[in-house]
From Swiss-Prot:
PANTHER family given in the database record: EUKARYOTIC TRANSLATION INITIATION FACTOR 3 SUBUNIT A, EUKARYOTIC TRANSLATION INITIATION FACTOR 3, THETA SUBUNIT
Quaternary structure (record): Component of the eukaryotic translation initiation factor 3 (eIF-3) complex. The eIF-3 complex interacts with pix.
Cellular component terms (Gene Ontology): eukaryotic 43S preinitiation complex; eukaryotic 48S preinitiation complex; eukaryotic translation initiation factor 3 complex; eukaryotic translation initiation factor 3 complex, eIF3e; eukaryotic translation initiation factor 3 complex, eIF3m; multi-eIF complex
Domain PCI: 319-502
Recorded family membership: Belongs to the eIF-3 subunit A family.
Protein name: Eukaryotic translation initiation factor 3 subunit A
Record flagged with keyword Cytoplasm: yes
SMART domains: PINT
One Pfam family named in its UniProt record: eIF3a_PCI_TPR-like
Amino acid sequence: MARYTQRPENALKRANEFIEVGKPLRALDTLQEVFRNKRWNYAYSETVIEPLMFKYLYLCVELKKSHIAKEGLFQYRNMFQLVNVNSLENVIRGYLKMAEEHTEAAQAQSSAAVAVLELDDLDNIATPESILMSAVCGEDAQDRSDRTILLPWVKFLWESYCQCLELLRVNTHCEALYHDIARMAFQFCLKYNRKSEFRRLCDKLRKHLEDICKSSNQTTGVSINKVETQQLCLDTRLYLLDSAIQMELWQEAYKAIEDIHGLMALSKKTPVPKTMANYYQKLAMVFSKAGNQLFHAAALLKLFQLTRELKKNLTKDDLQRMAAHVLLATLSIPLPSAHPEFDRFIEADKSPLEKAQKLAVLLGLPQPPTRVSLIREVVRLNVPQLVSEDFRNLYNWLEVDFNPLNLCKRIQSIVDIIETGPTETNLLSPYIQSLKDVTIMRLIRQISQVYESIEFKRLLELATFCNIFELEKLLVESVRHNDMQIRIDHQKNSIYFGTDLTESQREYRPDGPALQSMPSEQIRSQLVNMSTVLTRAVSIVYPNRERDQRAKLRTQMVHHYHEIKDREHQRILQRQKIIEDRKEYIEKQNNAREEEEARRQEEESRKAKLAEQKRLELEQEERERKRHQNEIQAIKEKSLKEKVQQISQTAHGKKMLSKLDEEGIKKLDAEQIAKRESEELQREAKELQSKLKSQEKKIDYYERAKRLEEIPLFEKYLAEKQVKDKEFWEATEKTRIENAIAERKDAVSQQERLKRMYPDRDEFLEALKKERASLYVEKLKKFEIALEAERKKRLADRVIRRREERRQAFLREKEEERLRKEEEIRLAQAAEERAAAEARRLEREAEDEKRRAQYEKQRAKEEEAERKIKEDRDRLAREVAVERERSDKERDTWRPRGGDRPSAASAGGGGGAGEWRRAAAPIGDRNERAGDRIERGGERMERGGDRMERGGDRMERGGERTEHRDRERRDNEGADSSWRVRREPDSQRGAGVKDASGSAAPPSRDDKWRRGGDRDRDRDRDFRNDGPRRDRDDRDDRDRGGFRRNDGPRRNDDAAPRETGGNWRDAPRQSDRDNRRPAGDRRDREVRGGDLRGPESRAPKEGGPSGGTGTAASGGGNWRTAPGPRDEPAPKRDQPQDKENKAVDDGEWTSVKRR
């Protein structure tokens, strides 16, 4: 079964329809099915799939389904990464743009929500709720709003960036897009201050870079050996470094510096000077934030060298500013410890020397820098000459001049110059504190060379930068690092320098300006100084000794050379030949090795290609197998999903599905789900019914109780309301009366005031009437004329309208009368049809009842007949057993007298022979016939089933044939006095009553098996008496040929003639053949097949149960050929459709009359 899938165009239309009706989830599922279907993956171009992909990503953004968007993006990448990279780039950029727009909208919404909250109440800005919230969670309203509104979209945008980076990390065609998205992710972290996400992003990019460096053999993989890839990675790491510095994540910045240095070392091309300058600048900033002044100054020095050498348009001011920066950073380096090896005894992961070596590698230095080496390099580069006079003096005061009494005052002036500089461009202010510390250390060292002891007060006067506590701390640090011998006497508030002359654990190397050595150092180096002085004295006393020794040594060397020069020359020539031979041998070995290596590589390449081809074939087979399995599983899941979706549209279906989890639903099939749905529906119906009953009872009780309680309250309320209404009416009436009186008084006063104007009014009216009397009369005539014309017109219109109304009313009455008569006729016809249908129904019911009664009666007779047959069979078996025992006894008695039989025969003549033959024959014949009867009884039982089958058809026509059969039976009884038609009581049949002739009375119809037995026994006796006549056919006419010679009932047969027809004459004539059923009709064969069988079909087989040569129809009393009414099988119960068919058939088949 093929899986039904929609085409991409239809899926897009379907999704738009779902979106219009407010079902985005259904729309997303529709589009997702397209991307999951592998049939459409490569069958359509990007012009068809790209709009669908944009709609898919739009729905993912709207619903915040980042994992579903990831799945679709991966599918789209696999489809178009080698076909159309621009389409993939447009889709990814559009996806990220939508995510950014939604995030910005959420940020604006969050800010607007906070603004609304802040402007809600200007009089009460700090509400109790806001105070409690800030005290509990430590967040303001903006933070809470961002967490609720903004944070979900920020998380979605972050996941989108991560998915796109993972999608494009190994695709060389989308390498530029990958680095653009990385920069967008850095901007995201800066904009929303996501430090933890920034760290994860750095780790992710570093992991991607490691993967690229490890494997670069893929077809679409990114190769780190490409110059473009190296430059893109370097630019991205520089951007990462800038972002880390802005976010003050110095650890990530240091890791980024390591990555940048690794990329620059990996690149075969020298980085551009701009990149290197940016690198040294950022590195100096990181070292400054880390507090490593030594490497900070080294980085600035490298930057200064690079800028000075490569920047051609560098101005003097810029050079002076950079030189001052470098000089001040170098001078601010703390004085080094005299024993750095002390750190070796501290347990740490890495020793300081290893760390320093690693940092020196980042700067491109062969060994870690020191303060002395940096100052020496600064002097070599002539940096002190490039700076201003003040900073040049600073260098001289700290590194050249020895003036401890004025050192701090001089440095303070430089500090004041730095502090008073512009704040925006002042890059030297971070070095002030370090410069002060270096100045204090210089002061202490210079003081120790001048003074043996000094008071704290005096030393504080000289060290104007610090207080007593800071000074004491610096002194302790100097002793800790074993730089100086210092002892502090707090009792005297004094400081002692170099008091222990026996202690000097290091060689004194003056760093900076020095006046003299310390006493302990002088004692430690006394022997060395003595040796130097003595050597100098010997050289003065014996000035030519050394020259003579050198001349003698030279002569010996020349003599030795002349002795070995030839031998050495030959050795050198031989060595040269050996070297040439060795080179040739090595070259041959290399060529052979290269050829072998080439052959080996070619063989490995061939094997690899074969293995790869085999692997691809296996993968293709595996993909096909999985695809087939997935399609089958998808079909099952789709059918199940459709069933679940169909069920979920109903309330009970949703309730039933809510009880099942995903695993439970997958284990069920559609039938089980439908079954559970029906069960759930029934259960809900029962629950609803019970709830309604309980609710009905509860509401009934509640309403009755409520109304009983309401009655006194209503009475009280009505009484109070009547009182209040009465009071209100009285007050209102009183107010109304007062207002009416006041109005009356006001009107009367007004009337009295206006009475004096009546004469003036009358005069004015009279004058006006006189002026306009003629005009009034003229207009009055025109009005009367127009009025008369309008009256006539309206009267004429009314006459016409009334005439038309009467005509329409007459037509309506006629139409209503016609419709009424038609309705009466239709109702009368419908009533007649209903009455006729009811009469037919009653008639059919009566006929069915009649047939049912006949069928029950016939069935009872059949059961009675079967019971009697069974009893006769049992009795016959017992009689046969008794006869066999008696025959055995008689055989034992007459066999010894075998000679008497002939004499008896001769004495008796023929009659005697006949007597003994007739007396002996029935014994064997009786046994034989008994067996035949038993066998015939079995056949009767077998044929009983056929009669039962035909009984249904006979029963249908039994009602019409009953009277005819009874009439023929009465005629036969009156015409024939044969013993076959006489019925004796069962008692007489059982007692064996004899007739008037002295012979046993013949058996009744219920003993039909006896009639056939007697007839056969008589025929058997005749056969023995007259042997030659055994071949003659002495049967009467009705027994020969199997057909009756007459059309009447069989003589001596009390059974009614069979309506189904047993005579060939009963076949329908030519006129009746059209009414017959087809020959293949089973009912026709069953009804007509009883007597239409030929002699061959009715004749028994040889050795059959009859025991004679005659047919089964021989003898008119044979029960097989003349079954009575009680032998007919019981009719079948009619089905409703069969009754209708048979009702139609009755009119067709009952027209065939017996002739």
